[in-house]
Amino acid sequence: RRRRKQPVRRALVAWVAATDALPILSSLIGALSRDNGPELMYLYMWLFWAWIVTVPPRLAFYAFNFVNLRRTGYVAACAFVLFALWGTTRGRTSIRVNRVEICSDRIPEAFDGFRFVQITDMHVGTLVRPERELTRLADSVNAQRPEAVFFTGDLVNIRAGELDERTTALLRRIAGPVWSVTGNHDVGTYIKDSLRFPAAGEAREVVARQRAMGWTVLEDTTVYLRRG
């Protein structure tokens, strides 16, 4: 029996060591990679997913098992795995609309009933299913029947190439005038290979591709809206 259990134990030890080493592996890949484009970001995402569904559940089991609550440990570990799976699938892509009524004496009466939508942080370069996710987002925005849409930064994750023709075509589905500003991800802050992809050039390209979609990009600019 001991001999039969040895291969199982060895496999278990190897599995534990491999999953524990995933953060180290990610760090090594990042250190050795010349660039950090979308492909590398996807790899990071999958490595993190593999870690989150293995190591924290195992630690939860260890904690309960330490106080002689093994069954509770199994339940806690399984619950954590299910929660992580939900978070990385349904939870990550769920859209929640928060409706806020703004009342102020500084708002002209002409804007009574004015409806706008504010969206932010799309990070289109790391969407798992861009077509489905951006279509749902556009439909959700359009369903609010806004008179204006404000995008408040971080359209891309790393660089301008993430705004390819397919992505921009999907974003054009957002109805109504769209005003946007750039975020820290949009201006090349996190580009690693800055020789091939200079931050200033990438920032200009992100702005240019937004304007090509019909968006109004505000760069140190003030715009006054008039109604009625």
What label would you give each PLM region?
Residues 110-228:
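Soluble catalytic domains of enzymes that build or remodel membrane lipids, polysaccharides, and related
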